[in-house]
């Protein structure tokens, strides 16, 4: 497992309509990673479904983890799944994971909201919500970082972690690896950490479980 083996195939930029961003970028990076950090304006569990083949590989075979920071503008379905975790569905996911990765991919693709709850309940995914302290505007940062323990691939651009952003809309991202642009990659790693730890002036970041109803309005 090494992100550096992708250096010959990773492009400097990806654009929806021209490139198949999910199978050409997201999935290969997930498969070679131990962690995925993502800061976005918008997130929906549909993104897990789209990249299921890579997500499942990272969290099951690689025993990797994801950290997500997003604005509180989540779908009602995703909020409900996270707040009212269906223990039966979580157990179903656990049994499938023990049996077959391919079956698990199919399950994540078919039931992304339950997959979201399963990943959070199993510690595979941590979610924090970011918002301006002033109450004006929204958190709309877009940073992504894949890491394998030694190397990293970072990306920035217009894509949100949604079906629209990853497939349907006209969007683009710029990508760079630590082997060719270490300073730029490290900048993005630190920028994500600052957001995650709540060290960005004017922005709060709190764990999803501590979010009040008012934050989602």
Model-identified regions with their sequence ranges:
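PLD/PLD-like phosphodiesterase catalytic module centered on the HKD motif
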Residues: 1-217
